[in-house]
């Protein structure tokens, strides 16, 4: 994903985003992540970069998210006692939701997990698990929660914003192993 949130160590400029987009292979969906950005800025990025999906990771209302005529997902910061299904229902026009850990004052990328039991509910659409995932815990997370996808950042970095190829490969291998085990258990 392309992070358009200047306060993030993973943030990219519009010029960097265009350079990245130019080398992305076919059938790979570019995701643009925004945090409480204004509509003009979001629209400007969408005009300049071939984004296939928007991820809203702030306090954006459903109507705001839906106005850009592009598939979108909404990140929900899960906190203790939260009714995850009810929060997801507010974003019923989204293509899905991303569940991340809540940490006051930080919209995401905290490296913290949340109480996964809160996500063990019937969610109304495809959902993505985020929040503190790494090579050590992602296999268990996928097997327990069976999300449509997982999202990782800090869990495969050597320092904020700097990815480690070895950690990425190990993370992908752990996800694949969980998927294979789930496929095997579904065949029985």
Predicted regions and their residues:
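Conserved N-terminal beta1-alpha1 strand-loop-helix module at the mouth
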Residues: 1-188
């Amino acid at each position: 994903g392309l992070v358009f949130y200047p306060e993030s160590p993973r943030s990219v400029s519009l010029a960097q985003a265009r350079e990245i987009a130019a080398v992305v292979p076919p059938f790979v969906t570019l995701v643009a992540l925004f945090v409480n950005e204004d509509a003009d800025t979001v629209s400007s990025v969408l005009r300049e970069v071939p984004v296939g999906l928007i991820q809203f990771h702030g306090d954006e209302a459903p109507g705001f998210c839906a106005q850009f005529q592009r598939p979108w997902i909404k990140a929900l910061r899960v906190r203790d006692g939260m009714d995850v299904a009810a929060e997801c229902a507010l974003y019923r026009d989204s293509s899905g939701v991303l569940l991340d850990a809540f940490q006051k004052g930080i919209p995401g990328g905290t490296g913290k997990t949340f109480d996964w039991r809160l996500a063990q509910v019937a969610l109304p659409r495809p959902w993505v698990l985020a929040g503190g995932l790494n090579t050590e815990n992602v296999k268990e997370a996928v097997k327990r929660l069976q999300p449509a996808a997982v999202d990782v950042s800090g869990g495969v970095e050597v320092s904020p914003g700097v990815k480690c190829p070895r950690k990425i490969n190990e993370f992908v291998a752990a996800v694949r192993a969980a998927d294979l085990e789930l496929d095997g258990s579904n065949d029985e």
